[in-house]
Design a protein with these regions (language model features):
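PLP-dependent aminotransferase-like
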Residues: 1-85, 92
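Residues at secondary-structure transition points
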Residues: 11, 35, 39, 96, ...
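Active-site region of PLP-dependent enzymes
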Residues: 88-94, 101-193
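Radical SAM/AdoMet-radical enzyme domain recognition
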Residues: 73-78, 96-104
């Protein structure tokens, strides 16, 4: 409800903040861990208040933000975990793929991403059937039945061309990620200052 708080890393992209504020919620910025550049698990608990409802984990730089401590805190305080998986397609935490671990996840398929479409594209994933139904309805003008709108919705459907491109590219994601890792390792080896 309006005024509820979502914990979010301070070093995130503005889109993560807008997703919170556009829904009448309050972002509470949490500093990043200086080593991982992910949300600092040691700063989370002191930021939790009676208004805190969720932690938004923004998986940055191809790394998972998940830690055992964050999962324990979410359970202890009954907080939802929302994943921003825009920069971490194919990333794993304890054998599970990011974007499939939290309560819901946002995925960007902007052309510059690891898994990019030809134009703007995105998706939301969740294992919560009721939430998935609401999201699908909102994305289709608020309608489950043609010309009957339950909500004020959006035109936010993934078009067939973008879906076809992503379907092909997804088959090669692991290979492409491995190539990126090799290039990054080469940079780290060559650039010494």
């Amino acid at each position: 409800k309006e005024g509820d708080e979502i914990l979010v890393p301070a070093n995130t992209f503005i889109a993560s903040i807008i997703a919170i504020t556009d829904n009448g919620l309050t972002p509470v910025l949490i500093e990043a861990n200086k080593d991982s550049l992910q949300i600092d698990e040691n700063e989370i608990e002191k930021a939790i208040s009676f208004k805190t409802k969720a932690i938004m984990l923004v998986h940055l730089y191809g790394q998972s933000s998940f830690t055992e401590k964050i999962i324990k805190l979410s359970n202890k305080f009954n907080l939802k975990i929302i994943e921003d998986n825009a920069q971490a397609h194919g990333c794993k935490f304890e054998g599970k793929i990011t974007g499939s671990i939290g309560d819901a996840a946002a995925h960007s398929f902007y052309p510059g991403k690891n898994l990019g479409a030809l134009g703007d594209a995105g998706a939301i994933t969740t294992s919560d059937y009721e939430l998935a139904t609401t999201i699908r309805t909102l994305a289709n003008y608020g309608s489950r039945i043609k010309y009957v709108s339950e909500y004020t919705g959006y035109n936010s459907r993934l078009d067939e061309i973008q879906a076809a491109i992503l379907d092909v590219k997804l088959k090669y994601l692991d290979i492409e990620l491995e190539k990126r890792k090799k290039i990054a390792d080469l940079y780290l080896k060559i650039i010494t200052n």
